[in-house]
Amino acid sequence: MQTFNIAVLSGDGIGPEIIAEAIKVLDVVQQKYAFKLNYRTFDVGGIAIDNHGTPLPEATLKGCEESDAILFGSVGGPKWEHLPPAQQPERGALLPLRKHFALFCNLRPATLYKGLEKFCPLRADISAKGFDMVTVRELTGGIYFGQPKGREGEGANEKAFDTEVYHRYEIERIARVAFETAMKRSKHVTSVDKANVLISSVLWREVVCDVAKDYPEVTLDHIYIDNATMQLIKQPEFFDVLLCSNIFGDIISDECAMITGSMGMLPSASLNEKGFGLYEPAGGSAPDIAGKGIANPIAQILSAAMMLRHSFNLNDAATAIENAVKNVLAEGHRTADLADESQPLSTKQMGDLIAQAVE
């Protein structure tokens, strides 16, 4: 029997509540599909600051190193906002984890599920068509990490600067992820750049075109970032796989999230070249609803499904979870973020229904 070790980092806010439901669903799936998951829990984020004085303790990092994947909840909250930026939960935990494990690729699916069209902020005739896309975002290069960056001078001559840097190998490896992802979907990649202005985007487009030659079955088109943000509003159904640099992917993936109607529905995966990944919901720690038992656990549950698919190659088990979510939603069950006039389900009730729906 295949056995996998998972580092469970519940974190802060709603993290522990939604992680509990993801594990509940994983426990059902591992019994039905004959594999074994070993969980080890570690502090991260604000709770780690409270208990250990740092958002990413050595024991947590070591536990992650000894695991096959990281199932991550959420970090942060008002309690720790007074700390220096580098010591705050988000910057002091997530960014070091991404760097330590060389998590260069972020996958963010965005799907408008049947029955949830009315929660989409787009016009009814657009949302009625539905959409199912994934953003493939380069995560470790680009303007967020390029050097030099800084501030200097004073008075009217004071200036600040950042540098957008991309190497050919960085673009090539993220492009290959996008094309491989498209091969398992609708075979369509849209590469987002600003090649009419930025030299880094000129190289980006050249390398993407080179990689595309290895995938003749995949349709490739290019779109400028400004036009991409417009077309996502006008015709989201056109897109399948969106390939983006770090900063453009940051923008696009959040726009995709917004048009689905709820951040509580959106999973994500951050992967390295060896298939090791950190899996987390796209939303934040939501301290305003933490402890109330009303958070939507679906994003966390779907993140667990992504873990089974991308790190463990358990595609059937992952699909079983995704189908369970679709079926529960199709039956009209909703948590508070998606409730209309019906009585909303609690976090636990939604987790129970999805676990029961796994086939």
From Swiss-Prot:
Substrate binds at residues 98, 108, 137, 226. Its EC number is 1.1.1.85. Pathway: Amino-acid biosynthesis; L-leucine biosynthesis; L-leucine from 3-methyl-2-oxobutanoate: step 3/4. It is found in: Cytoplasm. One of its GO terms (molecular function) is 3-isopropylmalate dehydrogenase activity. Gene3D superfamilies: Isopropylmalate Dehydrogenase. Pfam families: Iso_dh. PROSITE patterns: IDH_IMDH. Binds 1 Mg(2+) or Mn(2+) ion per subunit. Its main location: cytoplasm. Keywords: Amino-acid biosynthesis, Branched-chain amino acid biosynthesis, Cytoplasm, Leucine biosynthesis, Magnesium, Manganese, Metal-binding, NAD, Oxidoreductase. Its cofactor is Mg(2+); Mn(2+). Mg(2+) binds at residues 226, 250, 254. NAD(+) binds at residues 77-90, 284-296. It comes from the Bacteria. It catalyses: (2R,3S)-3-isopropylmalate + NAD(+) = 4-methyl-2-oxopentanoate + CO2 + NADH. InterPro entries: IsoCit/isopropylmalate_DH_CS, IsoPropMal-DH-like_dom, Isopropylmalate_DH. NCBIfam families: leuB. Catalyzes the oxidation of 3-carboxy-2-hydroxy-4-methylpentanoate (3-isopropylmalate) to 3-carboxy-4-methyl-2-oxopentanoate. The product decarboxylates to 4-methyl-2 oxopentanoate. This is 3-isopropylmalate dehydrogenase. It comes from Pasteurella multocida (strain Pm70).
